[in-house]
Amino acid sequence: MAKQVRSYSELSPNPSYELMYEEYLDDIRSSGIILRHKKSGARVAVMSNDDSNKLFCAAFRTPPTNSTGVPHIIEHSVLNGSKHFPSRDPFMQLVKGSLNTFLNAMTYGDKTLYPVA
């Protein structure tokens, strides 16, 4: 059974982030914490409970400026390696060498997600 974090103070707060909101959610028996990265403004949502299954998801706003599909092309490009990360297909390397139960990438009309469980 995983240890549940009940409050932000239990996390050894990182000075690069500020606490925006914190609440215990009775209906799902989870603690919810929202942080903001001070320099970039990126928000981090942390849900903690005693479930042994874990999830991480990087999500980005990718509002379209036209109908060329650039956000979807970028989604696939991110998963094809680069000069500094020369794996031809790092996504498939993660699938083969991981204990994950879910690994994917998806583009919606206004956002792109990279979930891992």
Positions of the model-derived regions?
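M16/MPP (pitrilysin/insulinase) zinc-metallopeptidase core fold and M16-derived inactive scaffolds
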Residues: 30, 48-117
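N- or domain-start disorder-to-order transition segments that initiate the globular core
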Residues: 1-51
